[in-house]
């Protein structure tokens, strides 16, 4: 099923019980975040706040708060059908000519869909029913959400930013967070490798000092919104891909103040320019990692016109510790990624980006291994094939018999098949998300690959001396005794599947260097010395037996090369890796550490008191 605009989609969701209208007055400052966060974590509906306090424009949140609604937005009934979308993209990325008449017939549905890809240009559109310009331009009239108490300013989150570089025919659509700093100015935070930033860079080279035209659309139809977050081939526009999803051409109209084409059905559109010489400090904001990011300088977008539909809807969201809406999108788009990767690497059986790993910082791959060293080739492929994975810090590769989405199964493969030292790969000074405060410097850090596949003869020949499995299995693990080894230890978890070879240790860390101090004490215990291969050390705020907590700590609090301790194996001691997933003190790092997002107890209590009245769940 396809949807011509956002309102058509909302009507469909409401009929299915997937949209809740909130008539009670709610403040866009913090209250909407608290309500939306609770709803998303419970798998609840999209929310339409019809009476935002101080504003006349309703606010839509949690639109893509379940993977099922993402699938609906892409015209699919079930999440598993998103694999078909990935197959289309894989084909469009590297199309193959038909091998014969039957093959041509099989490809016919794709060819028919491709015919719907060009845009349909309109002379008039609903998104320009109302036009503000000059002194009328005023973001204070739009209910822009403030998400967390320590955020520096209100934040625009779901805008489709439309740009065109001077050397390209097609436009780029991207979603970048935007900090409100005045009634007609926002800060455009886009990473250097993203399409909008690349277009601006090319513009500055060709037209130095000249203003760069930009339009930002809020509340487009779901296919166009989701097209902007999907790994579309560079040769294909997001509008064309949206037409492919929808089964009909994307309708666009020219902006009133520049030549950029915007979604004709959008609810609100900001138009203006970026002065290449105008920058401002962006942040800090609570983001998808669960922490506040550092301040960074980014370009300022000056708004000259705001156009909108009559009685528009403002589409918004929040970002915070997973799960949040970006994490849910990541789970759904995971199904799209699999066929794209399989096109290049047919040996891949499954690919999983766990949402608790901030959606992209860790990947688990299962594969049909065909030769020694094959797992390392797949690791390199993941890091290099798609831009979406250039910031993935950890890649774990397992055999096809392993369930990539089950941490017990993955850990079992790690403990059974890995020499922690020889089967781990570290690469330093690689591109890293600038929001990753655990990296040594902004934008540059290390990556780690873990080969948890069953080893072939050539690989075993490199293993050298190892502890006898039969001997090690006879040594029991006494968790209570281990807790008493060091006073800083508050809890220890040994997964049943790991046979004592993997443990999670919680400590009450109070100063630098205590992780190493604790594990060195544990290494003196014979059972740990002989059997253990992996230790994850976490702070006391992590649940030792909760994989979501553990993976979140590893992916947010570690630089793999700096924070992984190693000990080589011998005939009397197993090789070991220690993941120091604790918060770091100034002596242990070279940049400012992240501040965790914390909820205001008074706000939580206020929403508690009103929760039943909302009737959301």
UniProtKB/Swiss-Prot annotation:
Pathway: Cofactor biosynthesis; ubiquinone biosynthesis. It comes from the Bacteria. Pfam families: UbiD (PF01977), UbiD_C (PF20696), UbiD_N (PF20695). It is a peripheral membrane protein. SUPFAM superfamilies: FMN-binding split barrel, UbiD C-terminal domain-like. Keywords: Cell membrane, Decarboxylase, Lyase, Membrane, Ubiquinone biosynthesis. One of its GO terms (biological process) is ubiquinone biosynthetic process. Its EC number is 4.1.1.-. It is found in: Cell membrane. Its cofactor is a divalent metal cation. One of its GO terms (molecular function) is 3-octaprenyl-4-hydroxybenzoate carboxy-lyase activity. GO terms for cellular component: cytosol; plasma membrane. Signal peptide: none annotated. Residues 460-588 are annotated as: Unknown insert. Homohexamer. Belongs to the UbiD family. NCBIfam families: PRK10922.1, UbiD family decarboxylase. Catalyzes the decarboxylation of 3-octaprenyl-4-hydroxy benzoate to 2-octaprenylphenol. This is 3-octaprenyl-4-hydroxybenzoate carboxy-lyase. It comes from Vibrio vulnificus (strain CMCP6). The gene is ubiD.
């Amino acid at each position: 099923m396809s949807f011509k605009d956002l309102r058509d989609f909302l009507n469909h969701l409401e009929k299915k019980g997937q949209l809740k209208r909130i008539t009670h007055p709610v403040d866009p400052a913090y209250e909407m975040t608290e309500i939306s966060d609770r709803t998303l974590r419970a798998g609840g509906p999209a929310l339409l706040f019809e009476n935002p306090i101080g504003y006349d424009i309703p606010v839509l949140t949690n639109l893509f708060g379940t993977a099922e609604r993402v699938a609906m937005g892409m015209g699919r009934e079930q999440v598993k059908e998103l694999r078909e979308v990935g197959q289309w993209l894989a084909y469009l990325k590297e199309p193959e000519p038909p091998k014969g008449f039957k093959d041509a017939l099989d490809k016919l549905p794709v060819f028919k869909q491709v015919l719907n890809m060009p845009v349909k240009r309109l002379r008039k559109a609903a998104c320009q029913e109302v036009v503000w310009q000059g002194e009328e331009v005023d973001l204070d009239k739009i209910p822009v959400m403030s998400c967390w108490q320590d955020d520096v300013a209100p934040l625009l989150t779901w805008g489709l930013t439309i740009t065109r570089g001077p050397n390209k025919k097609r436009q780029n659509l991207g979603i970048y967070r935007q900090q409100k700093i005045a009634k007609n100015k926002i800060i455009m935070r886009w990473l250097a490798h993203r399409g909008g930033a690349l277009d601006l860079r090319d513009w500055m080279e060709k037209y130095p000092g000249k203003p760069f035209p930009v339009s930002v659309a809020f509340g487009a139809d779901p296919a166009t919104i989701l097209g902007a977050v999907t790994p579309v081939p560079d040769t294909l526009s997001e509008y064309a891909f949206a037409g492919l999803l929808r089964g009909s051409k994307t309708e666009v109209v020219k902006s009133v103040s520049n030549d950029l084409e915007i979604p004709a059905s959008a609810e609100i559109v900001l138009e203006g320019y970026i002065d290449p010489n105008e920058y401002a400090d962006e942040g800090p904001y609570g983001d998808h990692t669960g922490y506040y990011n550092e301040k960074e300088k980014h370009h300022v977008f000056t708004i000259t016109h705001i156009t909108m539909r009559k009685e528009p809807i403002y589409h918004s969201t929040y970002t915070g510790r997973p799960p949040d809406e970006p994490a849910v999108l990541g789970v759904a788009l995971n199904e799209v990624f699999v066929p794209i990767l399989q096109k290049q690497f047919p040996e891949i059986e499954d690919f999983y980006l766990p949402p608790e790993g901030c959606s992209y910082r860790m990947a688990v791959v299962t594969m049909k291994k065909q030769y020694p060293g094959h797992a390392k080739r797949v690791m390199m492929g993941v890091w290099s094939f798609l831009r979406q994975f250039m910031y993935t810090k950890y890649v774990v590769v397992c055999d096809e018999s392993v369930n990539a989405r089950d941490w017990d199964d993955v850990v079992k493969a790690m403990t059974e098949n890995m020499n922690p030292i020889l089967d781990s790969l570290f690469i330093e000074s690689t591109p890293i998300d600038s929001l990753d405060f655990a990296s040594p410097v902004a934008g540059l850090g290390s990556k780690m690959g873990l080969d948890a596949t069953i080893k072939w003869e050539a690989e075993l020949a490199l293993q050298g001396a190892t502890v006898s499995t039969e001997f090690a299995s006879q040594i029991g693990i006494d968790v209570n005794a281990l807790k008493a080894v060091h006073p800083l230890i508050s809890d220890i978890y040994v997964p049943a599947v790991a046979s004592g070879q993997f443990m999670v240790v919680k400590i009450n860390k109070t100063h630098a260097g205590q992780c190493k101090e604790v594990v060195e004490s544990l290494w003196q215990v014979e059972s740990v010395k002989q059997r253990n291969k992996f230790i994850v050390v976490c702070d006391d705020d992590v649940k030792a037996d909760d994989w979501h907590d553990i993976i979140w700590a590893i992916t947010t609090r570690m630089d793999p090369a700096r924070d992984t301790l190693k000990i080589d194996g011998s005939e009397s001691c197993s090789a070991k890796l220690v993941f120091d997933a604790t918060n770091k003190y100034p002596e242990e790092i070279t940049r400012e550490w992240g501040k965790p997002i914390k909820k205001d107890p008074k706000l939580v209590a206020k929403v508690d008191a009103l929760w039943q009245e909302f009737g959301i769940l």
